[in-house]
Amino acid sequence: MLMPKRVKYRREHRGKMRGRAKGGTEVTFGEFGLQAQNASWITNRQIEAARRAMTRYMKRGGKVWIKIFPSKPYTAKPLEVRMGSGKGAPEGWVAVVKPGKVMFEIAGVSEEVAREALRLAAHKLPVKCKFVKREENGGESNEN
C-alpha cells in the first residue's frame, strides 16, 4: 500500500479542488495513459486495486507507471461520537487528483491490451477517466 514514510504534520486541512491539474497532464514515461476527467480524492487502496487490475490483465507483459502518490492524510471520527472534542484520528491516505492529470501509464503492450487494462483500472477509481496516447513532437524544435 502506498503511503509516505514520514510526514511533518499528522493532520491536514481538506482543501479545495478547484481548477485543472498544473503538471502531469501528458504521457511521459509510457505509450498510453489514463487521464482524469474530474476532480476527486483517490485513496491508496483504490490505487492498489487499479494497479492489480492492470497487471493481472497484462499478465507479465508491459510496464506500469503510477504517476500519483497518496501524500495527504484524511481523518475520521469514530461512529456515534458527538461533535467537537478535536479533529479525528488519521484514517488513511489520499492523492488529490484534478481534471487533466495522467494517473497511470503503460508501455510494452499493444494498444488493444493497454486500452482494456486501463478500462479495468478506471472501474476501480472514483473519477471519470479517458484513454490517452503519447503525443510525439512532430518537427518542432525549441533549440536556437
Curated annotation (Swiss-Prot):
Function of the protein: Binds 23S rRNA and is also seen to make contacts with the A and possibly P site tRNAs.
Record-given protein name: Large ribosomal subunit protein uL16
Any single Gene Ontology cellular-component annotation: cytosolic large ribosomal subunit
Keyword set includes Transferase: no
CDD domains recorded: Ribosomal_L16_L10e
PROSITE patterns linked: RIBOSOMAL_L16_1, RIBOSOMAL_L16_2
Lineage: Bacteria, Bacillati, Bacillota, Bacilli, Bacillales
Keywords from the UniProt entry: Ribonucleoprotein, Ribosomal protein, RNA-binding, rRNA-binding, tRNA-binding
Matches recorded under InterPro entries: Ribosomal_uL16, Ribosomal_uL16_bact-type, Ribosomal_uL16_CS, Ribosomal_uL16_dom, Ribosomal_uL16_sf
Subunit structure: Part of the 50S ribosomal subunit.
GO BP field: translation
GO molecular function: rRNA binding; structural constituent of ribosome; tRNA binding
Family per similarity comment: Belongs to the universal ribosomal protein uL16 family.
Cross-referenced Pfam families: Ribosomal_L16 (PF00252)
Domain of life, per lineage: Bacteria
Keyword S-adenosyl-L-methionine: no
